């Protein structure tokens, strides 16, 4: 120091970092000897001063931060609000956990930042402050736990415990906090001893991989380098990357060279690079060295110990292994010190600079609605968004970066310092993330229900795991279940009404609840809001049209179950249960028109003699127009046409045409209705043959006599088939209308009677100015069977008239005697319909008539769905008979009397008018094949609660859909709780007939024509979104077990024109807690609307669980879940805990190449593209070489960045060249393909990349291999030395294989020489090796070996490869391949 270097005199307090910089400068100026002398003086000075000051720690020195109280209180308030939102179903468990953690972490972090200023202001010479902030002992985290708060803890798996420790160690911990603290600190894998051994094993494996890497040359002569751009990385990392390296190319500024190739880079040169902002710099690294099993001085660069180029013979491999392994060993101790305390990062916030109105460009391309990771609604910016805040006197412009959440609306007023945006927590805040599964467990017992508008496709076809496509709620509908143990009998029978209290008494005999595969669901039919049905009919309607218009065709289930005699329904007094065929068995069948259709009234109440179902027998079906006749004219009887009266949604049977004869006749004819303008090509009363053109685009299907009638706006063209007979003068025919001659009435042996054995229809035809003649038309005879064989339709015990409820069968002919029947566009015409009438004996003692209540039970046993229709007799107040046909009373529900007819399982007979809370539950038995152990589900009334009354609710459950201008369909919306009871009245409007294949006959059908009977039966079904679907009769009905609604393929005509009047509350609707449906009405609890009445609703309590896309739902729809069952699993990202505990396994994962995402997807794609193009340019031999090299180089860069990221996130600085040496070894092998090179290497043999290149050049043939990434363990077992491998692992296997192959160990590494006791080839022992290599170099070589075409291509390949690599590193904006940047 006396030599006098002009040093600047500084007078300021310095910390540990400043001392490090000072020592570095001292070494540069004075060298090692002088620096060590200076440091000795500093050390002596420090000890002397510390002794004189006599610093000691006492409990009084721990000063608590004054602002802690209100900070903790504020955090608690936020947690409470969050808990409430979670309970309401607004945020799901992961969002709640994430926000809770961030709230407490932000509080803890704020306290930590307050700590240093607090000490400075109150007591700058506090011993705790001096020690920790000088770096002498302890760190900020430990002091924070002493005087701030311990904060959030990690559990042994590294998961966060969301209950924070609010106390600090100065105040002392409560019992709960102490247990959480212990749980986080020393348990399981977090334990220090375990981690230390892991770190030691990692060091051993690392050294094993690189122990033979020694500096053995000065220059390998490589021309390649790796580019580093100062513009692409932070300055600090740029300096760390360059210092100590050697340049691979000359560096020019303009035409002036400022640094030459092979020059090492010091601090001065780096500063010049930064100052001039020059182009990317190409440097030499261990990756570019051409040596196979060692390294040269220039590719390694400066030695980190003394700052000069590394000496020959230095064992750089072992230094690299130790440098990476040692921080792991050291840092495991940190776990114990911080005690598993969570450290992470929170998102950065953008705050408003002043009060004012915020404005931005609300464009869907720029922003779209989203949920933040805390579940709050926000706008997600897809690119940079310019935001303006207009205050009174100034405009503030802010730019919100892409992928950020905007938390305010456009034109909203914001206050100063209000958070307006949340910047995505990227690399700057959360250093380290991982994907974690979080299971959510049910905290109550009940049935599982999914939102009806979400279809959950199973992940696997037969599993019970479903993925969620969009955000929706999962509901657990409350309801108890129990399973009897071993008892073959039960106190209750199936479907009994029961009291909930009896269940509690019985539960003593029941075992604990257990899961069961059989599930049951129950559907209720309930009344809707009252609404008068508008009468949209025009005055021109005839009586017949009114009948068609009001005929309800509520097609609920297509067919009655015929097979499965083991599922016979139980029958008891006052009850009838009918099995309905499940649609799973019918999935592949087309819908048969002959199926039994069950009709249910709107409110589920049957009156006496109500129609339960009807059956269309296919034998009585025809596709042609014609006339029906009941025997001869005098023999038929027409009962008065009352039809089916729609009375409060109940179909009472009143006969239309009922036959008294056992057979009837059908006279077919062909009818064409043509528009007025059409040109007819046949004359009236002319005879034509089959397939004759009768109009421009119309041909006849049958031959016969043509009758043409002109009507007002159309032409009716009839074709009568048959034979013409000209009567003699003796035959007097005095009738013009036709007469029916049934079979067997004429002369028995005459020719005519044999010819017309089915009977004939005789019709007299009188053409103008011509002789009249008689037309004999063929007749089809239909015999009516004596009743239908019900045994094949219903279980036999239902048809017997026992007890007091029975089914009666009535056949009737749909059309009147002599009435013409017209076909409409290829639909078949049903001539006879069979009605099943529900009847029971009138109880003479009771003053009120009984009604029957219908409901569906769906039982799911062993994967099969069985539907049962249950009908119960109940007492109901009788209505005045005079009001029955009153048109004003034809609404859905018009007065309060109907409320009490709405029987459901929560109303028992004697307590009908009381609140459901005091009423009974229903017990239902699951159909179990194991008869000894039936499973029960109890739905008690205590799970329901009643809200009401509503005074100002004005709404009607009517959904309107307009198909054309005048056509209005009225649909009675009485969807059951699970969305199943779809009941729709088919409609006719004034001008429009809609047939099965949507042919509109508007032009040809007028009001006069409508007096004839057309059979148009149209069914409409409504899905859960309120759209109305028209089912195609040829489509398959699929019962979707996910939402139990009938689905049909929609027709486009109806989709566009639907309009819905939304209702306030509808049956089956789910209501979240605190919702309010009336203006001053009560706040509801969360649940499902079960009953809606004029003044009240009944809601079944349910617990909502919010689930976001990508979540996995466990279990099936309608499955019974027990307390503690898994409902849903979320997949989410979370930040890692702050200890090396989590960092070390991650390093190991990367080094052992276990991680799936060790090479990013972009990189894989880029490699594939490169391989394709290169192969196309150069052909296969060189294409393989360059493709493999490029893959290896890119994966090396990616691996180095990954490992550095882990260590830097832990605050550990490791020089890149150490990691590069390790990565070079694990990426230096290639796998020989099975085709090619079979005469040199074995297929699938692992060989070094450089060896494969050289062999290919020597043999002058194509090389087939691919890059292969080995972990450090496998690399240690695939070296050139079998002695080294055997001393590492699997000694016997390695030695046996080496003996069989006859392997030779050349003893090039350190370990094998140590094992056999030789001199290791490093340091002084290195000189013998160098001497040998000089002799080796004196062997004469063939100078012309590389001449000719191969040499040219090879050099071309080298230049191309270098330019491609450098280009690739700089021209990829989405992921620049900077070598040493922690992205």
From Swiss-Prot:
Statement: the UniProt record of this protein carries the keyword Transcription: yes
Subcellular location: Plastid, Chloroplast
Amino acids binding Zn(2+): 220, 289, 296, 299
Cofactors (names): Zn(2+)
Cofactor note: Binds 1 Zn(2+) ion per subunit.
GO molecular-function term, one example from the UniProt record: DNA-directed RNA polymerase activity
Gene expressing this chain: rpoC2
InterPro entries: DNA-dir_RpoC2_beta_pp, RNA_pol_beta''_euk, RNA_pol_Rpb1_3_sf, RNA_pol_Rpb1_4, RNA_pol_Rpb1_5, Rpb1_funnel_sf
Catalytic activity: RNA(n) + a ribonucleoside 5'-triphosphate = RNA(n+1) + diphosphate
Span of the signal peptide: none
GO biological process: DNA-templated transcription
Uppermost EC category: transferase
Highest taxon, organism lineage: Eukaryota
PANTHER family, sorted: DNA-DIRECTED RNA POLYMERASE SUBUNIT BETA
Family listed: Belongs to the RNA polymerase beta' chain family. RpoC2 subfamily.
SUPFAM superfamilies tied to this protein: beta and beta-prime subunits of DNA dependent RNA-polymerase (SSF64484)
E.C. number(s) listed in UniProt: 2.7.7.6
Keywords linked to the UniProt accession: Chloroplast, DNA-directed RNA polymerase, Metal-binding, Nucleotidyltransferase, Plastid, Transcription, Transferase, Zinc
Subunit structure: In plastids the minimal PEP RNA polymerase catalytic core is composed of four subunits: alpha, beta, beta', and beta''. When a (nuclear-encoded) sigma factor is associated with the core the holoenzyme is formed, which can initiate transcription.
Protein name in the entry: DNA-directed RNA polymerase subunit beta''
Function, as annotated: DNA-dependent RNA polymerase catalyzes the transcription of DNA into RNA using the four ribonucleoside triphosphates as substrates.
GO cellular component terms given for this protein: chloroplast; DNA-directed RNA polymerase complex; mitochondrion
